[in-house]
Amino acid sequence: LQIAIRHPEIVDKIILGSALAKRNGVPDWFWDFMKQAKLENMPEQLKTAYKQVAPDTSGLQVMHDRDAKRMVNFKDISDEQIKFIKAPTLIIIGDKDVITPEHAIELHRQITNSELTIIPGGHGEYIGEITTIKPDTKESEFVVPIIEKFLDKKTE
C-alpha cells in the first residue's frame, strides 16, 4: 500500500494479501496480543525458517522485536491516501483471516480499480503460509489461478 501511495509511478498492479490499512481492520484482541508479543510465542516453523537463511540467531530477536513494535505503533492510512491508488489492485483475504471482511470490503470500495477475493481459510493460509500447512491443504489451489488471471489482464 505504501509504495502505491508514495510512488505510484513505479506501480503497475498491486496484490494486497491480508492488507491492513486501519487499526479497526482487525479485532481488538490483536493489538493486545502484539503489545505482549514475545519471541517464545513465535511459531516454531517461523523460527526454523529464519535460522535456515540467517544462522546468526541474534537477528531473530531483533526482527521479532522490530516487527512487534511496528505493529504496536501502526498508524491508520487515511481514506484520501487509499482513494489516491489508481493501479489495478487485487485484494485477497481468508474467510477466517485476522483482517475482517468488512475491512477488505472497505478497501475494495475505496480503491477504484480493485477486485476483492475472499478465499476459504485463515490468515496466510491461501498462499500456504508455513504455520497453516496441513496434509490436505488446498487453499493455494484457489488463489493461484485468481492471481495469474489478475496479472495477465491487460491494463489500459
Where are the model-predicted features located?
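Helix-loop "lid/cap" segments that line or gate small-molecule binding pockets
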Residues: K35-N41, Q45-D56, R66-N73
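Catalytic active-site module of serine/aspartate enzymes centered on a nucleophile-bearing elbow/loop
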Residues: P120-E156
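Flexible "cap/lid" loop of the alpha/beta hydrolase fold
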Residues: L1-R6, I10-L46
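Short beta-strand/loop motif that positions the catalytic acidic residue
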Residues: F84-I85, I91-I93
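Conserved alpha/beta-hydrolase "acid-adjacent" motif
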Residues: V98-H103
